């Protein structure tokens, strides 16, 4: 959810319509992390800017049907100028819609800049190689990780925004985002991961 917060923050700072979107695959605790992390990042930016930014959230109920993703996004882009997807192959349809409508899309899991350099604003990425390195080091040090679930965070260097973000995101916004990342690493910002933690985050933000 941490890189989702960062890309949400970027979307919030960069939207010109004050409407941004999120397309999820299927509702699940995993996709909730992307959804609510993104919403929280947008809200944080809106608070900084002293304005309201609406987040249109829709689910495709699929991770494979790119046509559904495209249809949802084409409609979203009537009001939204930036859409983030966490929807597997459905996201390819969202990227296609961004190209057609000449709007921004935010990629997921890997740096998706190569799919459409003119319309992929940034991506919330998992650095799998870094995670493998950490696990390998733990095993080499004699830790028994059998049957355990390993969680990786921004602080581990395993998640973050894509290295190509500087292609389309202005330098001053990247600097602000780097400062946000430091606050996440230090624990000053605790990124929500579901509806309950999101509502608590918003209540504290507006306190």
Regions found by a protein language model. Give the residues of each.
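A residue-level marker of the well-folded mature domains of exported/periplasmic proteins
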Residues: 1-207
């Amino acid at each position: 959810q941490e890189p989702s917060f960062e890309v949400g923050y970027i979307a919030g700072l960069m939207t010109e319509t004050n409407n941004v979107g999120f397309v999820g695959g299927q509702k699940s605790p995993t996709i909730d992390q992307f959804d609510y992390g993104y919403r929280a990042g947008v809200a944080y930016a809106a608070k900084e800017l002293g304005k309201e930014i609406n987040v249109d959230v829709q689910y495709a109920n699929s991770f494979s049907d790119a046509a559904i993703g495209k249809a949802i996004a084409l409609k979203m882009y009537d009001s939204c100028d930036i859409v983030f997807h966490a929807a597997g192959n459905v996201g390819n349809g969202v990227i296609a819609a961004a190209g057609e409508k000449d709007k921004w899309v935010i990629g997921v899991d890997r740096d998706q800049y190569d799919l459409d350099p003119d319309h992929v604003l940034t991506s919330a990425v998992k650095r799998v190689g870094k995670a493998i390195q950490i696990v390998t080091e733990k095993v080499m040090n004699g830790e028994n990780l059998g049957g355990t679930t390993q969680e990786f965070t921004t602080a581990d260097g395993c998640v973050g925004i894509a290295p190509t973000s500087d292609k389309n995101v202005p330098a001053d916004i990247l600097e602000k985002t780097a400062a946000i990342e430091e606050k996440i690493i230090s624990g000053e910002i605790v990124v929500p991961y579901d509806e309950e933690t999101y509502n608590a985050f918003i209540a504290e933000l507006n306190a």
